[in-house]
């Protein structure tokens, strides 16, 4: 393994970690007295998140789980994407 290969592998791990952290971000929107139409952006946000992931990683719809929950005054959008490891096995991120 050359030094360039090593540095590239570090970059990939760093990029993967950053992507994973970004996807694990829970979008919470406080709805104190706000109308329901203020949450209309959530489906568009979901689509854009998936488009960004698909730009860098090949994933099928079956590898993606999206959950929208209401917790009190908050709406929580959770996105989980199963990514293949080096051996091609999938695990939920």
Swiss-Prot record:
It holds the Pfam family MinE. InterPro entries: MinE (IPR005527), MinE_sf (IPR036707). Keywords: Cell cycle, Cell division. One of its GO terms (biological process) is regulation of division septum assembly. It comes from the Bacteria. Belongs to the MinE family. Prevents the cell division inhibition by proteins MinC and MinD at internal division sites while permitting inhibition at polar sites. This ensures cell division at the proper site by restricting the formation of a division septum at the midpoint of the long axis of the cell. HAMAP family: MinE (MF_00262). This is Cell division topological specificity factor. The lineage of its organism: Bacteria, Pseudomonadati, Thermodesulfobacteriota, Syntrophia, Syntrophales.
């Amino acid at each position: 393994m050359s030094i360039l290969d090593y540095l590239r592998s570090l970059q990939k791990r760093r990029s993967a970690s950053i992507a994973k952290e970004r996807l694990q971000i829970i979008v919470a929107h406080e709805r104190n007295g706000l109308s329901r139409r203020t949450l209309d952006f959530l489906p568009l946000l979901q689509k854009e998140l998936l488009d960004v992931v698909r730009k860098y990683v090949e994933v099928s719809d079956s590898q993606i789980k999206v959950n929208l929950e209401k917790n009190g005054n908050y709406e929580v959008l959770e996105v989980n994407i199963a990514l293949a490891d080096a051996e091609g096995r999938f695990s939920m991120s």
